[in-house]
Amino acid sequence: MSCSIILPNLINFINNDNNNIFEKNNEIQKQQQEEENKSNQVNNILNSIIESKFTSLNPKLKIQETPNQYQIKALIPLNFNKEEISVNVKNNRLIISAFKEIKFENQEKTKLTKFEKYQKTINVSNKNLDFSSIKAQFKDNTLTITIFKQSFEKEIKINIE
């Protein structure tokens, strides 16, 4: 065979092979970029969860005492609603708690669930409180709890058996 026949065929073969190599390389780079984008989306969701307002889950409390009652005001984070908040008394402790479950799903159908929980416990022993009189109101993200004091100043007649 002569060089004049082999050389053009070899050049064609190399050119075709180079085109295929470049196409494969471009395809691999595109796949890597897509994987990186998916990974970044998941990382962004996780970071938003981690960097969420954890400090807001520990709201400020303001406790005021009057001669007849105690009033406790708790600033609850904006993302909680009334149905997610509870107020209980157990073992001479006032327990204010809130719980929320938030579900995320992105375009790739990746699902994540975020839980937010807040709980504040206040010792109310030795306060002479009438626990049956507790009232709670939630308005403008402020939970106001009113507990009346027991009245020992009234005279109570006790029957003798």
Curated annotation (Swiss-Prot):
<dbReference type="Pfam" id="PF00011">
    <property type="entry name" value="HSP20"/>
</dbReference>
<dbReference type="InterPro" id="IPR002068">
    <property type="entry name" value="A-crystallin/Hsp20_dom"/>
</dbReference>
<comment type="similarity">
    <text>Belongs to the small heat shock protein (HSP20) family.</text>
</comment>
<dbReference type="InterPro" id="IPR008978">
    <property type="entry name" value="HSP20-like_chaperone"/>
</dbReference>
<protein>
    <recommendedName>
        <fullName>Small heat shock protein hspJ</fullName>
    </recommendedName>
</protein>
<feature type="domain" description="sHSP">
    <location>
        <begin position="52"/>
        <end position="161"/>
    </location>
</feature>
<keyword id="KW-0346">Stress response</keyword>
